[in-house]
Amino acid sequence: MNLHEYQAKQLFARYGLPAPVGYACTTPREAEEAASKIGAGPWGVKCQVHAGGRGKAGGVKVVNSKEDIRAFAENWLGKRLVTYQTDANGQPVNQILVEAATDIAKELYLGAVVDRSSRRVVFMASTEGGVEIEKVAEETPHLIHKVALDPLTGPMPYQGRELAFKLGLEGKLVQQFTKIFMGLATIFLERDLALIEINPLVITKQGDLICLDGKLGADGNALFRQPDLREMRDQSQEDPREAQAAQWELNYVALDGNIGCMVNGAGLAMGTMDIVKLHGGEPANFLDVGGGATKERVTEAFKIILSDDKVKAVLVNIFGGIVRCDLIADGIIGAVAEVGVNVPVVVRLEGNNAELGAKKLADSGLNIIAAKGLTDAAQQVVAAVEGK
């Protein structure tokens, strides 16, 4: 679950980290009033969406008058911002952040993620701030410096100083950087985060460090113990189908293809998508109904898949272990009866109660294409899409 920049900076303030004074505004009038609270200009105005590349898309601007602030707010509030990280529809701009402009001398990068290979939280820092860190990692990886947090000791000040020296910082900037490093590490661990990015972390012309931007990603599986973060969720920034799936504890990710996939188990779901691609198809989604699937959840999963107008066929691939294949069959039958299906449905059932599930589907009178194996299922669903 991602947070908006203004929400990230609210957290920074709670942990004593330096960030510009700013206010999130939902109307042009609020934006003008925010400027008055901040004081004399110039001011930075930023569209609040869960996507990078806002500046290049016109969603970030430095202005010198309250009239310009009002014009920016009137232009963007209620509109959709399209960046290189969004689809063609963009994301809705419901708030803009008005904050004091910063005199920038140099831009740095500081971020943290969970490194799956080392199973530790890893901090990354670079002198190449203000640009996409992925591009830096690809073209000049030697400019990214890393330290891993020991799960027993947690973050240590010497690690912050080590990164500061590698960035070429001196004097009081080393102390300031170390404080920011320790604060971000504390936020990451205490708030069950999956991602922190300060891009850019800037050195001002006055010689101080300040978090000019902030991107936080929370671990969705840990939100039950982070009620305040859960309240910050902005579902308007999410794919409606993904939000609906989350309410039913379904793991759904929308993709750009035309073959809907319903699978139990994340590994099997990824393998199913791979084999569909191998045979010339394009998955429309990743959907894992999980190990504790019920008839109701399977019905909802089917409805979510069919709500995508791009879907021209559906592949159901179930390996019955914890999930019984006959329950999956009941869910498919229920979904078809409730929603109606105008696209081919290919079903592959293996394992626990597979024969009973297949019999239920056969006796239902529905137009279901039974597959004899995973390869056969992929070939049949691709052929169905192509009209063969």
UniProtKB/Swiss-Prot annotation:
It comes from the Bacteria. Substrate binds at residues 264, 321-323. Disulfide bonds: none annotated. Pathway: Carbohydrate metabolism; tricarboxylic acid cycle; succinate from succinyl-CoA (ligase route): step 1/1. Keywords: ATP-binding, Ligase, Magnesium, Metal-binding, Nucleotide-binding, Tricarboxylic acid cycle. Its EC number is 6.2.1.5. GO terms for cellular component: cytosol; succinate-CoA ligase complex. It is an enzyme of class 6 (ligase). It catalyses: succinate + ATP + CoA = succinyl-CoA + ADP + phosphate; GTP + succinate + CoA = succinyl-CoA + GDP + phosphate. The keyword Nuclease does not apply. ATP binds at residues 46, 53-55, 99, 102, 107. Its cofactor is Mg(2+). Residues 9-244 form the ATP-grasp domain. Mg(2+) binds at residues 199, 213. One of its GO terms (molecular function) is magnesium ion binding. Succinyl-CoA synthetase functions in the citric acid cycle (TCA), coupling the hydrolysis of succinyl-CoA to the synthesis of either ATP or GTP and thus represents the only step of substrate-level phosphorylation in the TCA. The beta subunit provides nucleotide specificity of the enzyme and binds the substrate succinate, while the binding sites for coenzyme A and phosphate are found in the alpha subunit. Belongs to the succinate/malate CoA ligase beta subunit family. Heterotetramer of two alpha and two beta subunits. This is Succinate--CoA ligase [ADP-forming] subunit beta. It comes from Shigella dysenteriae serotype 1 (strain Sd197).
